Amino acid sequence: MSLCVVGAKTLVLATSAFTLSWTHSVQKTLWEEHWRIEQGGLRIVEASVEGSGAGMEPGEGARFDGRFWRWKPDVPPLPELLLRRSDAVPKGWTLCAAGKCRAIADRAETADVVAARPCRDGK
């Protein structure tokens, strides 16, 4: 499977898993989500947040590891993730896959919304 990141340009990543992270605009703490690409869409396998507050409450069953609250969300696969730009978070989203991290804003250029979805025929 591959992941397509679609904005002003399309980026195709040959990977079966990826991590999406960002810094919360108010709390200034890190949020990470680990995703797997499946036939049915994108499945979140773990979420973690560095601290809590202002809309960043850890999920059900979360455990604190000394730095992060970690949990496994119980939700069905999603067909795509829509990632919006925010002036409150200048660095935006970071996507890591196959040992390399990329700032989504670097790929999106002028796109306000970037979609991440399983590739179908390279698109």
Write out the residue ranges for each language-model feature.
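Mature, soluble, non-transmembrane domains
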Residues: 58-123
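N-terminal secretory signal peptides
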Residues: 4-58
